[in-house]
Amino acid sequence: MTTPRSRRPRGVVDTSVLVAGISGFRSGIVSSSNPSAQLLRDWIERATFTWLLSEEILSEYKAVLRRLKVRRETVGALINLLREEAELLSPGTKGSISSDPGDEPFCACAEAGDADFLVTLNPRDFPQGALTTKVLAPGEPLPSGRMTKRNASRKQK
């Protein structure tokens, strides 16, 4: 019998956290007063979690960052990094979970990707009871990785 293996936590990052994090990098040194920037730095430097996203989420990231006048080179580099390092999903639509229809892609991605967490600055938009994913604010400890579904099903046999 094989021993179940844990995995890195899997998470979805709301656009609000990405924007707040990037603003922390603009000022140079990432300070402890910007937990969104710390989350991004930790993911870039230490791969602290598996970032889950979809094409729809990538499009939103890109549109919001451009609207906020983040340099095109910065936006391009970030999108390329996410395409290379994150797990890109095609979740489809889940139905109405969030009170904000713009947040539905994040909910659908979290559910389809078996996310351990969804990190946001707007927790009211992501009702904890409607999601199987833990909703976190930046700076809260990330949950530890769970057993993979494949390994969990092996254990039950």
Task: Give the residues covered by each predicted segment.
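Active-site neighborhoods of divalent-metal-dependent phosphate/nucleic-acid chemistry enzymes
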Residues: 84-119, 123-124
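Residues that scaffold the ATP/ADP-binding catalytic core of kinase and kinase-like folds
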Residues: 20-22, 64, 129, 144-145
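Acidic, PIN/NYN-like endoribonuclease modules and their adjacent C-terminal/linker elements
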Residues: 104, 117, 123-157
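Short, active-site-adjacent cap segments at secondary-structure transitions
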Residues: 18-19, 59, 125-127
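Short, well-structured N-terminal submotif of metal-dependent ribonuclease cores
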Residues: 1-51
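Short secondary-structure boundary segments
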Residues: 15, 55, 121-123
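PIN-domain endoribonuclease scaffold, especially VapC-family toxins
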Residues: 40-97
